[in-house]
Design a protein with these regions (language model features):
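N-terminal secretory signal peptides and thylakoid transit peptides that target proteins
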Residues: 2-19
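C-terminal segment of N-terminal export signals and the immediately downstream linker at the start
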Residues: 26-46
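Active-site entrance/lid segments in N-terminal catalytic domains of soluble metabolic enzymes
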Residues: 39-219
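Active-site metal-binding loops of divalent metal-dependent hydrolases
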Residues: 67, 225-226
């Protein structure tokens, strides 16, 4: 008769797949000739005590994604208080708003948190400016994460001088190498499964392993398709020092997502998402993984034929930008990339709902972030014990 440990190991091997080559990487993500402790069968010892938990003083190797319009103080503080690292999604927040949000988070937790910035130009102008960096330094933020493009070396140096660590979300090995050359402290390897704005064309685990090999000894986290404890275990066994979790965190009580958005996530199945450039008068021509709604199906392959919005076009809804600070009313144009929040009204069938391809199929409920994190970590711990 098989023992519970044997069954757990068999379950994990099934999840890994025969071709995953998981034993090629150790717990540190180093090549197999540099692996640290291993068991009597030659398997690397992997646990939830990772470089991320040790260097950043957190209980869990868990980071909530800095999702624009969704990852506001309630979610960030909930994750930080649960022993992970909560990330504020700054998106298009202006510097005064960023400052207020950071202070709100600081008043709600003594845990670890950071700020995610988009380094790119939007229809509103540059999403991130020197003033945003100044705010982070003045507020003594301990972690800043950049998305889309690698920031200037001057920003990284300024943040480092202010005692802040800097990460880069990377969609490719080349971008990871560029970021490391610029001086970042860690890479979030974003696989193509990840929801939202995402330029990656490589699945999460293969990308993770390639990035680890390319940028060693820089710390690397896994992103894309992570919604369960088994996903966490798989990422750690392939060398990740932590996980970056987005879609699962949208389906939390603290996420600032409209109830209709959360409902649609729970009801998604099959080929639930698609990558499109249809959405985004506010941020045009950027690949965006969203739920595959009827609208997304209709425009698939014809995104280039969508005309720019005109003043006479009927809007698809109304919402509020900077909802926790400045509260600016906003009329949503057709194909708006602004995510539906509790302040949003209008035609939801015409809106975009960012979602990860694999994660969305694993969602079963909306619960407090702390419960989800504890469950994922407990399940991952059980699987890793079975593996070891």
């Amino acid at each position: 008769m098989n023992s519970p440990v044997d069954l757990t190991r068999r379950r994990l091997l099934t999840l890994l797949g025969a071709a995953s080559g998981v034993t090629a990487l150790g717990a540190s993500g180093r090549p197999d000739d540099q692996t640290s402790a291993a068991d009597s069968h030659g398997r690397p010892h992997v646990s939830l005590n990772t470089r991320l938990t040790r260097e950043y003083g957190v209980r869990h190797p868990f980071v909530s994604a800095g999702m624009g319009f969704v990852a506001y103080p309630p979610l960030v503080t909930a994750v930080a208080n649960a022993g992970g690292i909560g990330i504020l999604g700054n998106a298009i927040e202006p510097p005064p708003s960023t400052e207020m949000l950071i202070r709100m988070i600081g008043s709600g937790t003594r845990g670890s948190f950071g700020v995610d910035f988009i380094h790119d130009t939007t229809a509103f102008g540059p999403a991130t400016t020197d003033a945003h960096i100044d705010v982070c330094v003045a507020e003594r933020v301990k972690l800043v994460v950049f998305h889309m493009n690698v920031p200037p070396r001057a920003w990284i140096d300024r943040l480092h001088a202010g005692g802040c660590r800097v990460w880069q979300q990377a969609a490719s090995v080349e971008q990871a190498e560029e970021a490391v050359a610029a001086g970042v402290d860690a890479i979030v390897a974003q696989g193509r499964q990840a929801g939202g704005h995402n330029k990656s064309v490589t699945p999460a685990i293969p990308l993770l392993r390639r990035v680890i090999q390319a940028v060693h000894p820089v710390m690397v986290l896994a992103s894309g398709g992570i919604a369960t404890g088994a996903d966490v275990a798989l990422a750690l066994l392939n060398g990740a020092e932590g996980v970056w979790v987005g879609t699962r965190m949208v389906a939390t009580t603290e996420a600032f997502a409209h109830p209709e958005y959360k409902r649609r996530l729970l009801e998604a199945h099959g080929r639930a998402t698609a990558v499109t450039t249809a959405f985004g008068p506010e941020y045009p021509n950027v690949p965006y993984r969203v739920l595959r709604t009827d609208l997304v199906r209709r425009v698939a392959g014809h995104e280039d034929e969508i005309p720019p919005p005109q003043p006479t076009d009927p809007p698809i809804g109304q919402t509020v930008l900077f909802p926790f600070t400045l509260r600016v009313p906003y009329t949503m144009p057709q194909f708006s990339a602004v995510v539906p929040t509790p302040d949003t009204t209008g035609s939801f069938d015409l809106m975009g709902f960012p979602a990860g391809e694999e994660s969305v199929r694993k969602l079963k409920d909306v619960r407090p972030a702390a419960e989800i994190i504890e469950e994922m970590m407990d399940d991952a711990r059980d699987i890793l014990r079975g593996w070891s």
